[in-house]
Amino acid sequence: YNIKKISDKNEIDNIYSNFIKLSSQKNVFCSKEILNFFFNDLDLYTICKNDKIKSFVYLFKDKNNFAISEPFIYSGIVNHPKLNMKNSRYNNEVFKINELIIDEIFSTYKNININLPPNFFDARPFLWFNYGEDNKKKFLVTPCYTSIIDIQSREPIDVFNDIDDVKRRD
C-alpha cells in the first residue's frame, strides 16, 4: 500500500467520483463540496494498492494543527466498497489498511479527535495501537453507537459459505 497526501485541490473531484461516492461510508462531510470548501483546513490522504484507492482519510485541523472532529459530525476514514469480496476477505483488508492509517498517518499528530460513521465496524486497530506499552500514545475509543449482525434470517449453510475458504479450513 502507498499513502499519498493530497495537496492539489483539483484532485478532489476525481477522488470523489471514482472512490468516495461508491463507498458505503460516504457522508455529507466528505462530499466534494465540503472537501473543496474546507480544503485549506483539511489534511487529505489516499491509501492505494496498485494505483487503486482503497481508503481516503480526511482530517479537519484547528489553528494548533490538531486534528479535530468539529465542525464535522463524521470525519476520519472512508474505506473502499466491498463489491464482490467475501466478508472475511474484505474485513481483513480493511483491518490492515486501518492499521496502516493509524501507524503512518494518525500517529504523526500530537492530538487527534475524529468521529467515525456508524458503519465503521472494526475499532480494533485503534484499541490495539501501542497496546501494553506504558507511556506511549494511545487512542481513547468511545463508541457512540452499537452494531448487531442479524444472521437469524439466513440459512447456516449460507453463513458458512460466506466465510473465506482459508478461514473455513481453520
Placement of each model-derived feature along the sequence:
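Short, conserved acidic/polar surface loops in the N-terminal third of protein domains
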Residues: 68-71, 88, 123-128, 159-160
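Acyltransferase donor/substrate-recognition loop-hinge adjacent to the catalytic core
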Residues: 1-7, 128-170
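Non-catalytic accessory segments adjacent to catalytic cores
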Residues: 93-143
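An N-terminal domain-cap segment
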Residues: 12-52
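Short, flexible loop/turn elements at secondary-structure junctions
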Residues: 51, 118, 151-153
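Conserved donor-binding loop and adjoining core beta-sheet/short helix segment
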Residues: 35-100
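A short acidic, glycine/proline-enriched capping/turn motif at secondary-structure boundaries
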Residues: 83-85, 119-122, 154
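Extracellular structured ligand-interaction cores
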Residues: 42, 74, 109-111, 144-146
